[in-house]
């Protein structure tokens, strides 16, 4: 037991880390799209083939047809793969050319930018005691008087 370690060593399989997805080594990551489609359509044929048998009622037939229909819908979605999340992405991350992101940490520390306009209650809501930053506010008001 002296040499045992409880840390998980990451392993990379086909560009996927086992820390991100533990099944990367043995899961479905290695299958290509065509393999999945072929296996799926063969499964559809088997499901339809199960309708010809010795069952008496229609309950089994209904279940087989519904599950087969769901499998077909899933295969068609997988085949055409709509990019729904990309179409619906809000463009808030898209910035205009030349945009420079403010240094929010510096602005908070020096009470400049949007942080300079906060009231005492707003400062307290983000755990900043107004009395501790009064000297920064005095410096800002002195600059405004000079202008």
Swiss-Prot record:
Subunit description: Has been detected in a cytochrome bc1-aa3 supercomplex; its deletion however leaves complex activity unaffected.
Annotated membrane topology: Multi-pass membrane protein
Claim: Transmembrane is one of the keywords in the record: yes
Keywords: Cell membrane, Membrane, Transmembrane, Transmembrane helix
Compartment(s) where it occurs, according to its Swiss-Prot or TrEMBL record: Cell membrane
GO CC annotation, single: plasma membrane
Species in which this protein is naturally found: Corynebacterium glutamicum (strain ATCC 13032 / DSM 20300 / JCM 1318 / BCRC 11384 / CCUG 27702 / LMG 3730 / NBRC 12168 / NCIMB 10025 / NRRL B-2784 / 534)
Disulfide bonds: none
Pfam families, per the entry: DUF2631 (PF10939)
UniProt keyword annotation of Transcription present: no
Residue stretches spanning the membrane: 35-55, 62-82
Record's protein name: Uncharacterized membrane protein Cgl2017/cg2211
Domain of life, per lineage: Bacteria
